[in-house]
Amino acid sequence: DVTDIALHTVTVQNWDKTVTTIPTRKLISESFKNWRGMTESGGRRIKRALHLDQASVRFLEPSERDALRRFTLLRDYLDTKERELADWNAGLGADGELPVNARRITNLGTFRAYVERYLRHHPQVHRDLTLLVRQLQPGPTGLPLEIYCFTNDTRWAVYEGIQSDIFD
């Protein structure tokens, strides 16, 4: 919060209750982080990536899909995705019967769907702010699966606990 504005300085009380005095000329030449939006929105952003081994990405066998249907969060996804892919592959005619031409369900896509559904059902993830799970550009450490969401508590220690719980 800005506590004082003078001709040559602006005094700000930081989120940790420390006070910073900024020369007014610095307001033009440098950038500053304003935490007020976070406080007023009621959500604190989580933006982290899990790096997955690209060599582990593969198609799921029907028996694996059946086993994954026991996960409540995946049941609807698998049913919908199987119908979508069956329709797509049927549109290819005889070519759709060849595995090389057909679209199939992967462990990566299924994991991404699970993570997204897990976050949407997590009681400490803010329901009214952006939530997405996406793949980023692959690199030497693997294929990053980015988790982007907001907690429903902005207090630092609580936020860190929620973030740790999600990634544990």
Where are these regions (language model features)?
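Short, hydrophobic beta-strand segments
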Residues: 95-101, 142-155
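Intrinsically disordered, low-complexity acidic Ser/Thr-rich regulatory segments
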Residues: 93-116
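Residue-level recognition of well-ordered beta-strand positions that form the cores
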Residues: 51-53, 134, 146-150
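Short, conserved charged micro-motifs
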Residues: 59-62, 155-159
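Short secondary-structure junctions
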Residues: 119-130
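Short edge beta-strands and adjacent turn/loop segments
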Residues: 129-146
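Soluble accessory domains appended to multi-pass membrane transport proteins
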Residues: 1-95
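Short, non-transmembrane amphipathic alpha-helical segments
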Residues: 160-168
